[in-house]
Amino acid sequence: MPRRREVAKRVILPDPKYGDRVVAKLVNIIMLDGKKSTAEKALYGALELASEKVNEDPVKILKKSLDNIKPMLEVKSRRVGGSTYQVPVEVRAERRVSLAMRWLVKYANDRSEKTVTDKLAGEILDAYNNRGAAVKKREDTHKMAEANRAFAHYRW
């Protein structure tokens, strides 16, 4: 972590099919062992499946799903006088999106469908309808922050 100057954020180019940076970022999160084309196939297939079921633009479905997963608050550990408190803090906009994407992919992989495409499509549709494990994770995160509201004055 350099002290002299702010490190420039790497720019992610929009994906080739939808021309959207959010989709490109999600492809990068899904990707394993550098197999980007496999990750793209899985995500594009999932978005097509989702758009067939809802009859809406695939990118709109994805963005609404991510909006339903994004956490507004989270807790961070803060040590004060020998005891550790879970202090609720607001989540930065960039982190909200990346957490939402990570949770979406994580809980999609935990699903019981056969293919990755089906798993992703299922989790995207569940998030779109405010259901599913990723949305539950957001709710749990918010509950945790709400429960520890008394320690909010320890924010830094």
Swiss-Prot record:
Swiss-Prot/TrEMBL keywords: Ribonucleoprotein, Ribosomal protein, RNA-binding, rRNA-binding, tRNA-binding
Gene3D superfamilies: Ribosomal protein S7 domain (1.10.455.10)
UniProt GO molecular function: rRNA binding; structural constituent of ribosome; tRNA binding
One biological process term in Gene Ontology: translation
Keyword Repeat: no
Family matches, as Pfam families: Ribosomal_S7
UniProt record similarity statement: Belongs to the universal ribosomal protein uS7 family.
Subunit-structure text: Part of the 30S ribosomal subunit. Contacts proteins S9 and S11.
HAMAP family, per database record: Ribosomal_uS7_B
Chain's role: One of the primary rRNA binding proteins, it binds directly to 16S rRNA where it nucleates assembly of the head domain of the 30S subunit. Is located at the subunit interface close to the decoding center, probably blocks exit of the E-site tRNA.
PANTHER family: RIBOSOMAL PROTEIN S7
Name listed for the protein in its UniProt record: Small ribosomal subunit protein uS7
Organism name: Geotalea uraniireducens (strain Rf4) (Geobacter uraniireducens)
Upper taxonomic lineage: Bacteria, Pseudomonadati, Thermodesulfobacteriota, Desulfuromonadia, Geobacterales
